[in-house]
């Protein structure tokens, strides 16, 4: 089978898996729901609480903007406004496309709007995901005294401490041995039938560049603190919605719901994690004895609160920057034609034009030709 055929099979398989998972979780979420009581619960809720919930949600989003900027090298750190717009674009596409396609979209958007390197931006997204999971598990462990005594909660809290210790070990290993351990672990994966050597190589490269933040104690600590604060603020947003449904729960309930729904984002699913989000919220509320119908009505509203504003804001950003993004797309196409016709042998950079997509194999650092002729190339990675 050709490489293109393998890629298509992997893509179709991923979408199929996400669809199956979404249907399964949606079934779990709505099974046993009394739709008559559901309508009554939605009608009787106090939606004025959505105002403070939306304000704190916006504050948490801004903290994520600051967190993302911190992960960049001080020399290449993008400005706040392009970073904010790119993150909104990413949220928009995560809410309309499956498999967290918004992560790729915001990499492209930040490159177009802020001029950031695609390689470095990809690395920051990788480390963001790592920090998010670690922060949620750590908050789960810290919150154990205030959470209901449920077996799965305590087991997950212990896992959080184990991963925290693993992070310390990983940082020490990276400082002593560099990238060799990562390559040793990931290189054999290239032999698997559903992976490609270049993808594994890219994963090693992105992971290592992402861990630069962890190898700088100050940079890693600041980014992780922003991560913790953003999740805590988001927990307050969720708790304000709890007050709107008069569930009689403490702020700790908002934190537990955020932890459950946040960790559920790891699971491949449909756009906006429909079904998966609701099931996770119901599981969290079930620890407090909240009936499934009431929990489901709450999940619907808090999910809409976390989706609709970002869809609207993302559309606005895309519309305002339409010309910039179109010009960036045109530059990319011109770059492909130049690379395909001439290559970069003159400047000593090995470049291979990649089959169907026409993208260059190495396109991640700036390259400048002699002064008499400037190529329209934004980023080409230096030769190894």
Task: State where each predicted segment sits.
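Juxtamembrane helix-entry segments on the extracytoplasmic side of multipass membrane proteins
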Residues: 42-51, 151-163, 215-221
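Alpha-helical transmembrane segments and their immediate interhelical loop/hinge regions
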Residues: 199-245, 249-251
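Helix-boundary and loop/linker segments of multi-pass membrane transporters
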Residues: 8-9, 39-46, 75-80, 113-114, ...
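Transmembrane helix-loop-helix hairpins in multi-pass inner-membrane proteins
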Residues: 1-40, 90-197, 274-384
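Membrane-embedded helical hairpins/re-entrant loop segments and their flanking transmembrane helices
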Residues: 65-89, 242-257
């Amino acid at each position: 089978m050709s490489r293109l055929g393998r890629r298509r099979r992997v893509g179709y398989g991923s979408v199929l898996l996400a669809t199956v998972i979404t249907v399964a979780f949606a079934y779990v979420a709505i099974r046993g729901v009394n739709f008559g009581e559901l309508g009554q619960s939605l009608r009787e809720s106090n939606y004025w609480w959505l105002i403070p919930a939306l304000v704190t949600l916006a504050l948490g989003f801004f903290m994520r903007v600051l967190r993302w900027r911190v992960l960049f090298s001080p020399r290449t750190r993008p400005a706040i406004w392009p970073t904010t717009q790119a993150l909104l674009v990413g949220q928009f596409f995560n809410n309309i496309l499956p498999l967290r396609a918004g992560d790729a979209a915001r990499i492209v958007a930040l490159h177009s709007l802020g001029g950031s390197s695609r390689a470095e931006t990809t690395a920051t997204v990788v480390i963001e995901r790592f920090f998010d999971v670690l922060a949620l598990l750590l908050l789960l462990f810290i919150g154990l005294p205030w959470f209901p005594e449920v077996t799965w909660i305590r087991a997950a809290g212990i896992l959080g401490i184990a991963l925290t210790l693993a992070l310390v070990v990983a940082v020490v290993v990276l400082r002593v041995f560099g990238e060799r351990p990562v390559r040793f672990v990931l290189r054999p994966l290239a032999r698997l039938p559903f992976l490609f050597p270049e993808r594994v190589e890219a994963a090693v490269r992105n992971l290592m560049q992402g861990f630069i933040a962890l190898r700088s104690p100050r940079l890693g600590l600041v980014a992780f603190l922003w991560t913790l604060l953003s999740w805590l603020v988001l927990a307050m947003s969720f708790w304000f919605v709890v007050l709107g449904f008069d569930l009689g729960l403490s702020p700790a309930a908002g934190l537990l719901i955020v932890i459950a729904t946040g960790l559920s984002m790891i699971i491949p699913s449909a756009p906006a994690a429909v079904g998966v989000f609701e099931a996770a919220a119901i599981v969290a509320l079930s620890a407090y004895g909240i009936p499934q119908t009431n929990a489901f009505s709450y999940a619907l509203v808090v999910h809409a609160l976390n989706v609709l504003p970002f869809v609207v804001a993302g559309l606005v950003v895309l519309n305002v920057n339409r010309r910039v993004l179109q010009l960036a797309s045109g530059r990319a196409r011109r770059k492909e034609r130049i690379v395909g016709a001439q290559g970069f042998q003159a400047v000593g950079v090995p470049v291979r034009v990649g089959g169907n997509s026409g993208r260059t194999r190495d396109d991640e650092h700036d390259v400048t030709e002699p002064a008499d002729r400037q190529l329209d190339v934004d980023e080409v990675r230096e030769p190894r």
